[in-house]
Protein backbone atom coordinates (compact mmCIF):
# COMPACT_ATOMS: atom_id res chain seq x y z
CA UNK A 1 0.00 0.00 0.00
CA UNK A 2 1.44 3.36 -1.05
CA UNK A 3 0.71 6.10 1.47
CA UNK A 4 0.85 9.64 0.14
CA UNK A 5 0.41 12.58 2.45
CA UNK A 6 -0.51 12.94 6.09
CA UNK A 7 -3.53 12.08 8.24
CA UNK A 8 -5.65 14.16 10.60
CA UNK A 9 -8.13 12.91 13.20
CA UNK A 10 -10.88 14.88 14.93
CA UNK A 11 -13.41 14.33 17.70
CA UNK A 12 -16.84 15.97 17.79
CA UNK A 13 -20.05 16.12 19.81
CA UNK A 14 -20.52 14.70 23.29
CA UNK A 15 -17.49 12.73 24.52
CA UNK A 16 -17.67 9.10 25.61
CA UNK A 17 -15.63 6.81 27.83
CA UNK A 18 -14.11 5.13 24.74
CA UNK A 19 -13.82 7.85 22.09
CA UNK A 20 -10.09 7.94 22.82
CA UNK A 21 -9.85 4.21 22.09
CA UNK A 22 -10.92 5.01 18.53
CA UNK A 23 -8.25 7.70 18.43
CA UNK A 24 -5.71 5.15 19.67
CA UNK A 25 -6.73 2.75 16.91
CA UNK A 26 -6.38 5.39 14.21
CA UNK A 27 -2.98 6.47 15.53
CA UNK A 28 -1.72 2.87 15.58
CA UNK A 29 -3.00 2.26 12.04
CA UNK A 30 -1.25 5.39 10.79
CA UNK A 31 2.00 4.40 12.48
CA UNK A 32 1.76 0.86 11.12
CA UNK A 33 1.24 2.24 7.60
CA UNK A 34 4.25 4.54 7.87
CA UNK A 35 2.37 7.84 7.69
CA UNK A 36 4.86 10.63 8.29
CA UNK A 37 2.67 13.19 10.05
CA UNK A 38 -0.25 12.22 12.30
CA UNK A 39 -2.23 15.33 13.12
CA UNK A 40 -5.09 15.94 15.53
CA UNK A 41 -7.76 18.63 15.34
CA UNK A 42 -7.77 20.57 18.59
CA UNK A 43 -11.51 21.05 19.29
CA UNK A 44 -12.79 19.36 16.16
CA UNK A 45 -13.58 21.04 12.87
CA UNK A 46 -14.04 24.35 14.71
CA UNK A 47 -10.44 24.27 15.88
CA UNK A 48 -9.29 23.05 12.48
CA UNK A 49 -10.79 26.15 10.82
CA UNK A 50 -8.53 28.18 13.13
CA UNK A 51 -5.54 25.95 12.29
CA UNK A 52 -5.48 24.66 15.85
CA UNK A 53 -3.64 21.50 14.86
CA UNK A 54 -1.65 19.06 16.99
CA UNK A 55 1.24 16.76 16.11
CA UNK A 56 0.01 13.55 17.75
CA UNK A 57 3.39 11.82 17.57
CA UNK A 58 4.60 14.31 20.18
CA UNK A 59 1.76 13.44 22.56
CA UNK A 60 1.19 9.72 22.02
CA UNK A 61 4.76 8.52 21.81
CA UNK A 62 4.70 4.82 22.68
CA UNK A 63 2.56 1.80 23.52
CA UNK A 64 2.26 2.90 27.16
CA UNK A 65 0.73 6.20 26.02
CA UNK A 66 -1.68 4.30 23.77
CA UNK A 67 -2.69 2.04 26.66
CA UNK A 68 -3.27 5.07 28.89
CA UNK A 69 -5.19 6.85 26.13
CA UNK A 70 -7.60 3.90 25.99
CA UNK A 71 -8.24 4.39 29.72
CA UNK A 72 -8.80 8.14 29.47
CA UNK A 73 -12.36 9.48 29.28
CA UNK A 74 -13.68 12.54 27.45
CA UNK A 75 -12.17 13.80 24.19
CA UNK A 76 -8.37 13.84 24.37
CA UNK A 77 -8.23 16.22 21.40
CA UNK A 78 -11.08 18.38 22.62
CA UNK A 79 -14.50 18.38 21.01
CA UNK A 80 -16.90 20.89 19.47
CA UNK A 81 -20.54 21.33 18.58
CA UNK A 82 -19.89 23.37 15.47
CA UNK A 83 -22.11 22.48 12.53
CA UNK A 84 -20.71 23.09 9.06
CA UNK A 85 -23.00 25.23 6.91
CA UNK A 86 -24.46 23.84 3.71
CA UNK A 87 -22.05 23.96 0.79
CA UNK A 88 -24.27 26.11 -1.41
CA UNK A 89 -23.73 29.75 -0.57
CA UNK A 90 -20.89 28.97 1.85
CA UNK A 91 -18.14 27.86 -0.52
CA UNK A 92 -15.59 30.08 1.23
CA UNK A 93 -15.78 27.86 4.35
CA UNK A 94 -14.98 24.76 2.31
CA UNK A 95 -12.28 26.52 0.33
CA UNK A 96 -10.63 27.42 3.63
CA UNK A 97 -10.84 23.84 4.90
CA UNK A 98 -9.25 22.43 1.77
CA UNK A 99 -6.57 25.11 1.68
CA UNK A 100 -5.57 24.07 5.22
CA UNK A 101 -5.58 20.40 4.20
CA UNK A 102 -3.28 21.21 1.29
CA UNK A 103 -1.02 23.39 3.45
CA UNK A 104 -0.33 20.45 5.77
CA UNK A 105 -0.36 17.87 2.96
CA UNK A 106 -3.27 16.06 4.61
CA UNK A 107 -4.77 13.35 2.41
CA UNK A 108 -6.70 11.40 5.04
CA UNK A 109 -9.36 12.98 7.24
CA UNK A 110 -11.01 10.93 10.02
CA UNK A 111 -13.85 12.36 12.10
CA UNK A 112 -15.28 10.67 15.19
CA UNK A 113 -18.82 11.50 16.22
CA UNK A 114 -22.55 10.96 15.98
CA UNK A 115 -25.27 12.04 13.58
CA UNK A 116 -24.21 15.65 13.07
CA UNK A 117 -20.54 14.73 12.86
CA UNK A 118 -21.28 12.21 10.11
CA UNK A 119 -22.98 15.07 8.27
CA UNK A 120 -19.63 16.89 8.36
CA UNK A 121 -17.95 13.88 6.75
CA UNK A 122 -20.70 13.74 4.12
CA UNK A 123 -20.41 17.40 3.14
CA UNK A 124 -16.62 17.36 2.98
CA UNK A 125 -16.54 14.22 0.85
CA UNK A 126 -19.26 15.67 -1.41
CA UNK A 127 -17.29 18.89 -1.85
CA UNK A 128 -14.12 16.93 -2.62
CA UNK A 129 -15.92 14.84 -5.25
CA UNK A 130 -17.50 17.89 -6.87
CA UNK A 131 -14.21 19.79 -7.07
CA UNK A 132 -11.81 17.01 -8.02
CA UNK A 133 -10.05 16.90 -4.65
CA UNK A 134 -8.05 13.82 -3.72
CA UNK A 135 -8.49 13.82 0.07
CA UNK A 136 -10.28 10.88 1.69
CA UNK A 137 -12.91 11.36 4.40
CA UNK A 138 -14.00 8.62 6.80
CA UNK A 139 -16.37 8.63 9.76
CA UNK A 140 -15.78 6.76 13.01
CA UNK A 141 -19.06 6.14 14.88
CA UNK A 142 -19.28 7.46 18.40
CA UNK A 143 -22.36 8.05 20.50
CA UNK A 144 -23.62 6.88 23.85
CA UNK A 145 -27.13 7.46 22.44
CA UNK A 146 -26.66 4.41 20.15
CA UNK A 147 -28.88 6.07 17.55
CA UNK A 148 -26.75 5.82 14.40
CA UNK A 149 -28.33 3.67 11.67
CA UNK A 150 -26.80 0.76 9.73
CA UNK A 151 -24.33 -0.25 12.45
CA UNK A 152 -25.66 -2.79 14.99
CA UNK A 153 -24.51 -0.54 17.82
CA UNK A 154 -22.19 2.40 18.40
CA UNK A 155 -18.89 2.58 20.26
CA UNK A 156 -19.53 4.43 23.50
CA UNK A 157 -22.92 2.88 24.14
CA UNK A 158 -21.68 -0.31 25.81
CA UNK A 159 -19.68 1.54 28.46
CA UNK A 160 -22.46 4.05 29.15
CA UNK A 161 -24.93 1.16 29.45
CA UNK A 162 -22.57 -0.62 31.85
CA UNK A 163 -22.31 2.50 34.02
CA UNK A 164 -26.09 2.94 34.04
CA UNK A 165 -26.78 -0.70 34.92
CA UNK A 166 -24.11 -0.66 37.63
CA UNK A 167 -25.38 2.59 39.13
CA UNK A 168 -29.01 1.44 39.07
CA UNK A 169 -28.00 -1.74 40.87
CA UNK A 170 -26.32 0.33 43.58
CA UNK A 171 -29.18 2.85 43.83
CA UNK A 172 -31.70 0.03 44.25
CA UNK A 173 -29.58 -1.53 47.00
CA UNK A 174 -29.35 1.83 48.77
CA UNK A 175 -33.07 2.53 48.55
CA UNK A 176 -33.88 -1.01 49.74
CA UNK A 177 -31.85 -0.57 52.91
CA UNK A 178 -34.68 1.00 54.95
CA UNK A 179 -36.89 -2.08 54.70
CA UNK A 180 -40.58 -1.79 55.65
CA UNK A 181 -40.16 1.30 57.83
CA UNK A 182 -40.09 3.92 55.09
CA UNK A 183 -41.64 4.12 51.63
CA UNK A 184 -39.60 6.12 49.15
CA UNK A 185 -39.19 6.50 45.41
CA UNK A 186 -36.14 7.41 43.36
CA UNK A 187 -36.41 8.79 39.83
CA UNK A 188 -33.23 8.30 37.80
CA UNK A 189 -33.01 10.68 34.83
CA UNK A 190 -30.92 9.32 31.97
CA UNK A 191 -29.78 10.92 28.71
CA UNK A 192 -31.80 10.29 25.56
CA UNK A 193 -33.59 12.96 23.55
CA UNK A 194 -35.49 10.89 20.99
CA UNK A 195 -33.96 7.43 21.41
CA UNK A 196 -34.21 5.49 24.67
CA UNK A 197 -31.29 3.09 24.31
CA UNK A 198 -29.51 4.45 27.39
CA UNK A 199 -32.53 4.37 29.66
CA UNK A 200 -33.38 0.87 28.46
CA UNK A 201 -29.96 -0.19 29.78
CA UNK A 202 -31.35 0.26 33.31
CA UNK A 203 -32.96 -3.15 32.78
CA UNK A 204 -29.49 -4.71 32.64
CA UNK A 205 -29.18 -4.28 36.42
CA UNK A 206 -29.88 -7.73 37.83
CA UNK A 207 -32.39 -6.30 40.31
CA UNK A 208 -33.74 -3.87 37.73
CA UNK A 209 -35.99 -0.84 38.35
CA UNK A 210 -39.75 -1.02 38.71
CA UNK A 211 -40.61 1.17 35.74
CA UNK A 212 -38.68 2.30 32.65
CA UNK A 213 -39.92 5.13 30.43
CA UNK A 214 -38.47 5.78 26.97
CA UNK A 215 -39.11 8.68 24.55
CA UNK A 216 -40.30 6.30 21.82
CA UNK A 217 -43.77 6.10 23.44
CA UNK A 218 -46.04 8.85 24.77
CA UNK A 219 -45.88 9.52 28.50
CA UNK A 220 -49.13 9.79 30.45
CA UNK A 221 -48.63 11.60 33.81
CA UNK A 222 -51.93 10.33 35.24
CA UNK A 223 -51.10 6.72 34.42
CA UNK A 224 -47.62 7.25 35.87
CA UNK A 225 -49.02 8.49 39.19
CA UNK A 226 -51.49 5.60 39.29
CA UNK A 227 -48.73 3.01 38.75
CA UNK A 228 -46.52 4.53 41.44
CA UNK A 229 -49.44 4.55 43.87
CA UNK A 230 -50.09 0.87 43.20
CA UNK A 231 -46.40 0.04 43.67
CA UNK A 232 -46.39 1.91 47.00
CA UNK A 233 -49.10 -0.45 48.27
CA UNK A 234 -46.96 -3.48 47.41
CA UNK A 235 -43.42 -2.40 48.35
CA UNK A 236 -41.49 0.27 50.21
CA UNK A 237 -38.67 0.88 47.74
CA UNK A 238 -39.54 2.16 44.26
CA UNK A 239 -36.93 2.97 41.61
CA UNK A 240 -37.87 4.36 38.21
CA UNK A 241 -35.67 5.10 35.17
CA UNK A 242 -36.77 7.84 32.76
CA UNK A 243 -35.29 9.29 29.58
CA UNK A 244 -34.70 13.03 29.67
CA UNK A 245 -36.64 13.29 26.40
CA UNK A 246 -39.93 11.61 27.30
CA UNK A 247 -42.86 13.41 25.68
CA UNK A 248 -46.55 13.95 26.20
CA UNK A 249 -49.09 12.87 23.60
CA UNK A 250 -49.16 16.46 22.26
CA UNK A 251 -45.42 16.34 21.50
CA UNK A 252 -44.19 18.51 24.35
CA UNK A 253 -41.25 17.34 26.42
CA UNK A 254 -42.34 16.41 29.93
CA UNK A 255 -39.52 18.57 31.31
CA UNK A 256 -41.28 21.60 29.80
CA UNK A 257 -44.05 21.17 32.39
CA UNK A 258 -41.56 22.37 34.98
CA UNK A 259 -40.66 25.43 32.91
CA UNK A 260 -37.54 23.82 31.47
CA UNK A 261 -34.95 25.79 29.52
CA UNK A 262 -35.49 26.91 25.93
CA UNK A 263 -31.75 27.10 25.28
CA UNK A 264 -30.30 25.38 22.21
CA UNK A 265 -26.93 23.67 21.83
CA UNK A 266 -24.47 24.25 18.99
CA UNK A 267 -26.30 21.79 16.76
CA UNK A 268 -29.65 23.54 17.33
CA UNK A 269 -31.03 20.91 19.72
CA UNK A 270 -33.13 21.97 22.70
CA UNK A 271 -31.29 21.43 25.98
CA UNK A 272 -33.28 19.08 28.17
CA UNK A 273 -33.18 18.79 31.95
CA UNK A 274 -35.43 18.58 34.96
CA UNK A 275 -37.80 15.74 34.09
CA UNK A 276 -36.60 13.66 37.05
CA UNK A 277 -37.10 16.46 39.55
CA UNK A 278 -40.52 17.24 38.09
CA UNK A 279 -41.70 13.63 38.36
CA UNK A 280 -40.34 13.30 41.91
CA UNK A 281 -42.38 16.36 42.92
CA UNK A 282 -45.42 14.97 41.12
CA UNK A 283 -45.18 11.68 43.02
CA UNK A 284 -44.95 13.39 46.40
CA UNK A 285 -47.78 15.79 45.57
CA UNK A 286 -50.18 13.16 44.23
CA UNK A 287 -49.36 10.11 46.37
CA UNK A 288 -47.62 11.41 49.48
CA UNK A 289 -44.68 9.09 48.83
CA UNK A 290 -41.32 10.68 49.57
CA UNK A 291 -39.46 10.94 46.27
CA UNK A 292 -36.17 12.32 45.02
CA UNK A 293 -34.41 12.44 41.68
CA UNK A 294 -30.92 11.58 40.50
CA UNK A 295 -29.59 12.93 37.22
CA UNK A 296 -26.60 11.03 35.84
CA UNK A 297 -25.83 13.88 33.41
CA UNK A 298 -22.25 13.71 32.10
CA UNK A 299 -21.29 10.89 34.49
CA UNK A 300 -22.84 8.33 32.15
CA UNK A 301 -20.56 9.29 29.28
CA UNK A 302 -17.24 9.79 31.09
CA UNK A 303 -17.07 6.94 33.60
CA UNK A 304 -13.82 5.36 32.41
CA UNK A 305 -13.45 3.47 35.70
CA UNK A 306 -16.30 1.12 34.70
CA UNK A 307 -15.88 0.75 30.93
CA UNK A 308 -16.87 -2.32 28.96
CA UNK A 309 -13.89 -4.17 27.52
CA UNK A 310 -16.06 -5.12 24.55
CA UNK A 311 -16.73 -1.43 23.94
CA UNK A 312 -13.07 -0.42 24.28
CA UNK A 313 -11.95 -3.11 21.84
CA UNK A 314 -14.64 -2.28 19.29
CA UNK A 315 -13.93 1.45 19.49
CA UNK A 316 -10.23 0.79 18.91
CA UNK A 317 -10.94 -1.50 15.95
CA UNK A 318 -13.31 1.07 14.41
CA UNK A 319 -10.61 3.73 14.54
CA UNK A 320 -7.98 1.38 13.13
CA UNK A 321 -10.21 0.26 10.26
CA UNK A 322 -11.27 3.83 9.40
CA UNK A 323 -7.63 4.73 8.81
CA UNK A 324 -7.01 1.54 6.83
CA UNK A 325 -10.03 2.17 4.62
CA UNK A 326 -8.88 5.73 3.94
CA UNK A 327 -5.41 4.48 2.99
CA UNK A 328 -7.04 2.01 0.58
CA UNK A 329 -8.90 4.84 -1.16
CA UNK A 330 -12.32 4.71 0.50
CA UNK A 331 -14.07 8.00 1.17
CA UNK A 332 -17.49 9.25 2.25
CA UNK A 333 -18.09 6.23 4.48
CA UNK A 334 -18.63 5.34 8.14
CA UNK A 335 -17.30 2.25 9.89
CA UNK A 336 -20.03 -0.21 10.89
CA UNK A 337 -20.24 -3.14 13.30
CA UNK A 338 -22.15 -6.29 12.40
CA UNK A 339 -22.93 -8.91 15.03
CA UNK A 340 -22.31 -12.34 13.52
CA UNK A 341 -23.30 -14.19 16.69
CA UNK A 342 -24.54 -13.16 20.14
CA UNK A 343 -23.70 -16.51 21.80
CA UNK A 344 -20.76 -16.61 21.54
CA UNK A 345 -20.46 -12.91 20.82
CA UNK A 346 -18.69 -12.32 17.49
CA UNK A 347 -18.62 -9.21 15.32
CA UNK A 348 -17.26 -8.12 11.96
CA UNK A 349 -16.48 -4.62 10.68
CA UNK A 350 -17.15 -2.86 7.40
CA UNK A 351 -17.85 0.62 6.06
CA UNK A 352 -21.04 2.10 4.65
CA UNK A 353 -22.06 5.04 2.48
CA UNK A 354 -22.18 8.12 4.71
CA UNK A 355 -25.23 9.43 2.84
CA UNK A 356 -27.29 6.63 4.38
CA UNK A 357 -26.07 7.54 7.87
CA UNK A 358 -25.86 11.32 8.26
CA UNK A 359 -28.82 12.90 10.07
CA UNK A 360 -30.68 9.58 10.33
CA UNK A 361 -31.75 8.52 13.82
CA UNK A 362 -32.36 4.93 14.96
CA UNK A 363 -34.73 4.37 17.87
CA UNK A 364 -35.50 1.44 20.14
CA UNK A 365 -37.88 -0.90 18.25
CA UNK A 366 -41.42 -0.50 19.55
CA UNK A 367 -41.77 -4.27 19.88
CA UNK A 368 -39.00 -4.13 22.50
CA UNK A 369 -41.04 -1.73 24.66
CA UNK A 370 -43.57 -3.64 26.75
CA UNK A 371 -46.03 -3.35 29.65
CA UNK A 372 -47.86 -0.39 28.10
CA UNK A 373 -44.64 1.53 27.58
CA UNK A 374 -43.21 1.02 31.06
CA UNK A 375 -40.50 -1.61 30.50
CA UNK A 376 -38.30 -3.34 27.92
CA UNK A 377 -38.39 -6.90 26.63
CA UNK A 378 -36.03 -9.84 26.87
CA UNK A 379 -35.10 -9.17 23.24
CA UNK A 380 -33.50 -5.91 24.33
CA UNK A 381 -31.60 -7.69 27.11
CA UNK A 382 -30.35 -10.25 24.59
CA UNK A 383 -29.21 -7.41 22.32
CA UNK A 384 -27.52 -5.26 24.96
CA UNK A 385 -25.99 -7.72 27.44
CA UNK A 386 -22.94 -8.64 25.30
CA UNK A 387 -22.09 -4.96 24.82
CA UNK A 388 -21.35 -4.40 28.52
CA UNK A 389 -19.24 -7.50 29.05
CA UNK A 390 -15.65 -7.42 30.28
CA UNK A 391 -13.76 -4.75 32.15
CA UNK A 392 -10.46 -2.90 31.97
CA UNK A 393 -8.71 -1.92 35.17
CA UNK A 394 -7.62 1.73 35.33
CA UNK A 395 -4.03 2.64 36.07
CA UNK A 396 -3.93 4.34 39.47
CA UNK A 397 -1.78 7.17 40.73
CA UNK A 398 -2.12 8.73 44.20
CA UNK A 399 -5.23 6.64 44.75
CA UNK A 400 -7.20 7.85 41.71
CA UNK A 401 -7.32 6.70 38.06
CA UNK A 402 -4.50 7.98 35.90
CA UNK A 403 -5.31 9.69 32.59
CA UNK A 404 -3.30 11.19 29.74
CA UNK A 405 -3.78 14.78 28.60
CA UNK A 406 -2.33 17.07 25.98
CA UNK A 407 1.01 18.54 26.94
CA UNK A 408 1.96 22.09 26.00
CA UNK A 409 4.42 20.89 23.39
CA UNK A 410 3.33 19.51 20.06
CA UNK A 411 1.18 22.42 18.85
CA UNK A 412 1.67 23.21 15.17
Question: How would you label these PLM feature ranges?
Answer:
Residues 2-54:
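N-terminal phosphate-binding or glycine-rich loops at protein starts, especially the Walker A/P-loop
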Residues 16-26, 48-49, 93-95, 115-123, ...:
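Short glycine/serine/threonine-rich phosphate/pyrophosphate-binding segments
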Amino acid sequence: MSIKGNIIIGQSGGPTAVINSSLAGAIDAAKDAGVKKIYGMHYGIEGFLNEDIIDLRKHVKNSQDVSLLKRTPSAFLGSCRYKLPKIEGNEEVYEKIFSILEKYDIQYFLYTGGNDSMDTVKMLSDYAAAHGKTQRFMGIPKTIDNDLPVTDHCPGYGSAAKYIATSLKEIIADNDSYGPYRTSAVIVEIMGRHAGWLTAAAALANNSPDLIYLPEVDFDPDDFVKRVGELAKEKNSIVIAVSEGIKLADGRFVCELSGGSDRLDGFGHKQLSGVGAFLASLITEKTGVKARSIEFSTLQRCASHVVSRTDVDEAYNAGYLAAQKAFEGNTGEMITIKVESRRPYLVSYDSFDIHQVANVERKVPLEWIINDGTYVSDEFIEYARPLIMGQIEPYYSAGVPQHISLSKEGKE
